[in-house]
Curated annotation (Swiss-Prot):
The keyword Cytoplasm applies. GO terms for cellular component: centriole; centrosome; ciliary basal body; cytoplasm; spindle pole. InterPro entries: CEP19 (IPR029412). Keywords: Cell projection, Cilium, Cilium biogenesis/degradation, Cytoplasm, Cytoskeleton. PANTHER family: CENTROSOMAL PROTEIN OF 19 KDA, CENTROSOMAL PROTEIN OF 19K CEP19. This is Centrosomal protein of 19 kDa.
Amino acid sequence: MSIVAKRCGVKFTPPSIIIIYENKTSGKMRKRVIPVRNFSQYSDCSRAAERLKHHVRHSVYLECVSLAQLERLHLLLRDHLQGASLEESLAAHRHQEEEEDLNKLSDEELSRRKAQMDDLFQRNRRRRGDPDFVYDLEVEFGEGSVKETCSWDEEQSDQEF
């Protein structure tokens, strides 16, 4: 049975992971609700995600879903069990992703991240045919704008050379 995952998400009550997938043989879209059992606010999310991905019953549906995606979904579930709202949880994890060191990733993971960034760039890009496209956009920064100083802008560092 060939299955391609299209979307995945979480359901808070009862704690579940939801996979929307396409069955390639029949061409139909289906929804699978996978209950997350024995999961508490103190559970290890990476372990739970790995256990779920390799579960006999659910591995067929989760083979297209990355382990990192499953970990993020488990983090959302854990944050909900700890009392955080969905918005707070998403904001906290988005901030962690922004500070991630891309130099420490494997080549495969790095190329996947670059492809995601390129896709996001292409979606946000303004083209000539767009209604809000401006060819020569000029932006003036007012007098009240804050100027940030950098360590290399200091005059005393020039004396060292």
